[in-house]
Amino acid sequence: MHALQAKILDPRIGNEFPLPAYATVGSAGLDLRAMLKEDTVLEPGQTLLIPTGLSIYIGDPGLAALILPRSGLGHKHGIVLGNLVGLIDSDYQGELMVSCWNRGQTAFNIAVGERIAQLVLVPVVQAHFELVEAFDESQRGAGGFGHSGSH
């Protein structure tokens, strides 16, 4: 398991609400909580930038973090991430913020401390461009957008 430096920016974390933790041995994501000043209603079509009260520093350029939606919120209530996926670079040190979007038809109450997203660490491979005049042939070539077949 990798060590991840974290700073608690909201004193309610560690007191009223636990630090992010893996729910099971097989969990890939750490739950992030809505550290709002008060419960907030997210109206249909509305987006809101929600503080998590936590900052992290990954430090290792071979890693990054992704902020991903919690499946139950999207499926049951239409609450998804406004930017679909949040990418946290290894050298970022600011507060983790979650953009929530209500794509549903009804208002949704976000309670203080509610688990709203999850943080997943992923490996990163940095590449450089090697400029060429032509590519070696591949089976697919430049075909895209359904080129490989139908359902």
UniProtKB/Swiss-Prot annotation:
One of its GO terms (molecular function) is dUTP diphosphatase activity. Its EC number is 3.6.1.23. This is Deoxyuridine 5'-triphosphate nucleotidohydrolase. Substrate binds at residues 70-72, 83, 87-89, 97. Gene3D superfamilies: 2.70.40.10. It comes from the Bacteria. The keyword Magnesium applies. Pathway: Pyrimidine metabolism; dUMP biosynthesis; dUMP from dCTP (dUTP route): step 2/2. Its cofactor is Mg(2+). It comes from Pseudomonas savastanoi pv. phaseolicola (strain 1448A / Race 6) (Pseudomonas syringae pv. phaseolicola (strain 1448A / Race 6)). SUPFAM superfamilies: dUTPase-like. GO terms for biological process: dUMP biosynthetic process; dUTP catabolic process. The lineage of its organism: Bacteria, Pseudomonadati, Pseudomonadota, Gammaproteobacteria, Pseudomonadales. Belongs to the dUTPase family. It is an enzyme of class 3 (hydrolase). This enzyme is involved in nucleotide metabolism: it produces dUMP, the immediate precursor of thymidine nucleotides and it decreases the intracellular concentration of dUTP so that uracil cannot be incorporated into DNA. It catalyses: dUTP + H2O = dUMP + diphosphate + H(+).
